[in-house]
Amino acid sequence: MAILKLEDGTIYTQLHDISRELSSLNIQLNHWPVGDNLETHNLLEKDVLSDDQKEEFLQSVDHYFEELKETAGYQSRDLLAIHPEIPNLDAILSKFDKCHTHADDEARYIVAGICIFGFVRPDDSQVELTLQPQEYINIPANTEHWFYLTPEKRVKAVRYFSSTEGWTPHYTSTEIHFKKS
């Protein structure tokens, strides 16, 4: 269940409330079940997956990818598996914990773990959205945002791409009003 936190401390957990608060950004948020396949769930329990295991998992949820290809023109996908044992993880994550934008939409399907996206709304107020397993988010191109993990530093996410050129972060000078949880 997604959790949206406003700067004044207000917290929303109902999808209709979260959607209302994010409507000015045109962010899409959906609940996408992973399914009941035991092997799929076993793969999600592992920190490190081989390329073959990643592909096996991706194929188990490809019905979502097929829908995105048809409706939004996505061309490829991969499975990102972040865990604390990744060398230089903090340096890698530091590329995304500052306000930035991307030239393309950022589409993520969180399948394990927890992550936080923060957003700057058109009125310059800020919100933070905690995403949990089985939640899909699409952040439109040029939306000012940041990203970080919980202290556990574990997340698995399917990333959907319409191209790879638009994934370079373009940093802004906006100061983040929230403190990392």
Swiss-Prot record:
Gene3D superfamilies: Jelly Rolls. The lineage of its organism: Bacteria, Bacillati, Cyanobacteriota, Cyanophyceae, Oscillatoriophycideae. Monomer. It comes from Trichodesmium erythraeum (strain IMS101). The record marks 108 as: Important to generate the dianion. This is Acireductone dioxygenase. InterPro entries: ARD, ARD_bac, RmlC-like_jellyroll, RmlC_Cupin_sf. Catalyzes 2 different reactions between oxygen and the acireductone 1,2-dihydroxy-3-keto-5-methylthiopentene (DHK-MTPene) depending upon the metal bound in the active site. Fe-containing acireductone dioxygenase (Fe-ARD) produces formate and 2-keto-4-methylthiobutyrate (KMTB), the alpha-ketoacid precursor of methionine in the methionine recycle pathway. Ni-containing acireductone dioxygenase (Ni-ARD) produces methylthiopropionate, carbon monoxide and formate, and does not lie on the methionine recycle pathway. CDD domains: cupin_ARD. Its EC number is 1.13.11.54, 1.13.11.53. Keywords: Amino-acid biosynthesis, Dioxygenase, Iron, Metal-binding, Methionine biosynthesis, Nickel, Oxidoreductase. Belongs to the acireductone dioxygenase (ARD) family. Pathway: Amino-acid biosynthesis; L-methionine biosynthesis via salvage pathway; L-methionine from S-methyl-5-thio-alpha-D-ribose 1-phosphate: step 5/6. Fe(2+) binds at residues 100, 102, 106, 145. Binds 1 Fe(2+) cation per monomer. Binds 1 nickel ion per monomer. GO terms for biological process: L-methionine salvage from methylthioadenosine; L-methionine salvage from S-adenosylmethionine. Ni(2+) binds at residues 100, 102, 106, 145. The record marks 105 as: May play a role in transmitting local conformational changes. It catalyses: 1,2-dihydroxy-5-(methylsulfanyl)pent-1-en-3-one + O2 = 3-(methylsulfanyl)propanoate + CO + formate + 2 H(+); 1,2-dihydroxy-5-(methylsulfanyl)pent-1-en-3-one + O2 = 4-methylsulfanyl-2-oxobutanoate + formate + 2 H(+). HAMAP family: Salvage_MtnD. Its cofactor is Fe(2+); Ni(2+). It is an enzyme of class 1 (oxidoreductase). GO terms for molecular function: acireductone dioxygenase (Ni2+-requiring) activity; acireductone dioxygenase [iron(II)-requiring] activity; iron ion binding; nickel cation binding.
